[in-house]
């Protein structure tokens, strides 16, 4: 154990003033040379405009930000450590609570990593992959709507808040119908998805697709040409491509700087290479460019969802491996659909072997060959990666999340320093951090 002097100066070049040393005239002269309005303030962690319990330590000279430091960790929940004490299936229920605004992306990245270690990536049913893509794109739109609503509210556009949450509610109703929950779904599982789409889900999604394009046009009419909105975002929070790459920023931050880096295109998964969509980019690298990128991404997600609905064919939604899938998941009805309550009731009540098999899988889980993998997906905030290590048992040896919120927060100093204190709100909002994922 190493001991350190708590009174040591962290920065050797910083001036040290004591009551027993130094020439007081020199001390007074040194302080007099500083800006008379220099102050240090805390923004957060209890602040309505920091997207959760984010703390910013700002050094100000008048209204200008001379230094911006990020303090994280206030929402640490030990998700990664808890996964080491749960089976590979149970870990999904923890990971879905990391980035609580886009849980389906964390679930997918984790399940893809497990499937890669199991060597069953190519065995995932087509219907399961289509459902995964469709759910993720719905979740992408929902996440961007929260960003639009909260970001608009923070800079005074209260109408954007009302409209954003209005449309998001439609998506949450779809999620509730399909997964049973509005958030923290644990719907995507190793090998596929937990259950098939219920009756009426496709119709409800098509209804949303009919409504949403006009609503996006409404957002543009409301905000894109609005003078106050443009002045609050244009030229604010600038970060060029060199800075974004140096700081590891991904997602809309990088695409707003002009680089079309999207993992759905450059490293496809779940069959994304077969879908027709564009990667929106801008070149200005400011808050307004990030706003335009996210608005365009919602349109592209609608295109992908439309293609998913056209590709839905009857079939299983779980890999046909009895060592991984529960017996009820391997049943198909006459219509080609599976996982209805009738199927589960029939299998669990008539087959003792199936009941025993189900009990063993639920209580002990399945074994995953030893090894380690890293699997990234394109979340609404950027590259969300899962580094999974297996020791050959039924529980993960290590699960690490490469959370884009955590990495992207490194850009706070770059986008805030030199600007006005009022622009800090807009700059942080354009980064769109979710502290549940950042602190996890």
UniProtKB/Swiss-Prot annotation:
Q: Where in the cell is it found?
A: Cell membrane
Q: Which molecular function term from Gene Ontology is one that the record holds? A: quinone binding
Q: How does it sit in the membrane?
A: Peripheral membrane protein
Location, primary (coarse class): membrane
**Alphabetized InterPro entries for the sequence:** NADH_Q_OxRdtase_suD, NADH_UbQ_OxRdtase_49kDa_CS, NDH1_su_D/H, NiFe-Hase_large
Q: Which reaction does it catalyse?
A: a quinone + NADH + 5 H(+)(in) = a quinol + NAD(+) + 4 H(+)(out)
Top-level lineage group: Bacteria
* Keyword Cell membrane in annotation: yes
What EC class does the entry list? translocase
Entry's family note? Belongs to the complex I 49 kDa subunit family.
Role noted for this protein: NDH-1 shuttles electrons from NADH, via FMN and iron-sulfur (Fe-S) centers, to quinones in the respiratory chain. The immediate electron acceptor for the enzyme in this species is believed to be a menaquinone. Couples the redox reaction to proton translocation (for every two electrons transferred, four hydrogen ions are translocated across the cytoplasmic membrane), and thus conserves the redox energy in a proton gradient.
Q: Which NCBIfam families does the protein's record reference?
A: NuoD, PRK06075.1
The protein here is known as NADH-quinone oxidoreductase subunit D
Its gene name is nuoD
